[in-house]
Amino acid sequence: MKHKQRWAGAICCFVLFIVVCLFLATHMKGAFRAAGHPEIGLLFFILPGAVASFFSQRREVLKPLFGAMLAAPCSMLIMRLFFSPTRSFWQELAWLLSAVFWCALGALCFLFISSLFKPQHRKNQ
């Protein structure tokens, strides 16, 4: 059980990254383009990183990053196979790599916020 808990952050990030990617590929395509800000959808990738960092064993950043890096090629394959590509391969690759960045940033933000609320144990000298 302990071995599975070590990889809970990576698995959680892998699944949530693909879910967010599919959600943005299906539902949000027209909304952000009509507003003139297609990159706003990338901010949704902060959520998988933060949630995965919460489920990581010691509130790590590397396990969510690893899960996002594994999910990016799977997401690219799913988007290429099941959706008609509207952008070139290189544009979608750049979009997915920036999504990995935002996912890691979400894990870092959660780590920062949780360190602010963690009680400090200081020795009085």
From Swiss-Prot:
Which stretches are transmembrane? 7-27, 35-55, 65-85, 93-113
**Coarse class of the protein's main subcellular location:** membrane
List GO terms (cellular component aspect).
Answer: plasma membrane
Cellular localisation: Cell inner membrane
What keywords sit in the KW lines? Cell inner membrane, Cell membrane, Membrane, Transmembrane, Transmembrane helix
- Membrane association type: Multi-pass membrane protein
Which parts form a coiled-coil structure per UniProt?
none
Question: What highest taxon heads this organism's lineage?
Answer: Bacteria
Stretches of the chain found on the membrane's Cytoplasmic side: 1-6, 56-64, 114-125
Q: Does the keyword Repeat apply?
A: no
Q: Which residues lie on this side of the membrane: Periplasmic?
A: 28-34, 86-92
Name of the featured protein = Inner membrane protein YbjM
**What is the source species?**
Escherichia coli (strain K12)
Name the encoding gene, please.
Answer: ybjM
